Amino acid sequence: AGLDSKLYTKNALKKGAKVVKDHIFGATAVGEYIESFITNALFEDIGNGDVTSLATINKEQTGEAVFYVKEDCVIAGIDLAKMICNQVDPLLSTFFNFSDGEFVNKNTSIGTIKGSIQSILKSERLLLNCMQRMSAIATKTNYFVHLIAPYNVKILDTRKTTPNFRICEKWAVKIGGGVNHRFGLYDQVLIKDNHIKASGDIKKAIESCSDYLKSKNLQIPVIVEVKNLEEFNRIKNYRLLTVFWLIILNQKLL
């Protein structure tokens, strides 16, 4: 049966919020963030109207779209797809046979959308773009998660994301079994080589960071990248630091 659109949207927004809630500094409304993304993406694609569909399809005409996967994958973006459909037309009914994070074999039907053909075609491209990209990220993430399973390590994401699509790409990493790192420049301190060079010294960078956080009464994670074990040993006893990233350049760990 079709899902109640308004009820589903609230639940889906909560699920999306769980992905990044620990990385949003200052109580950012994640649900509004996702809704805003959908609104802007739809306007980018539709503008003032889908002129081809408006010109060729009766607005009362209804139909059904069936979605298949072209490759084996970890499916991702189903919750987002339902939110997109709801925002385009609350009367669209969505029926999906899988949930985000499930493995799907090639050529499998994952679900259908029923309702106004004009509405289906307006939502189709954004829906497919998001699901294809998110599923690719989730699948690749899942591959590496299984690859490192014997070791006590985790796969983290980065800020190297598609502009204005970060929340969905990090969502996909989470779906694939990875761990979300900082969402932006505001929710964690990450002292890297550029900061160290500008400060003149790794200890100076850390001390300046400590002074700044105290002056602003900020309690957020502090991470520092070190390029060798010598740098690591110099700063390992700083209580301010919560995590170390050991980046060894041009050397083999094993």
Task: Locate the predicted segments by residue.
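Acidic/glycine-rich phosphate/pyrophosphate-binding loops and surrounding catalytic core
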Residues: 2-238
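Low-complexity basic/metal-binding stretches
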Residues: 237-254
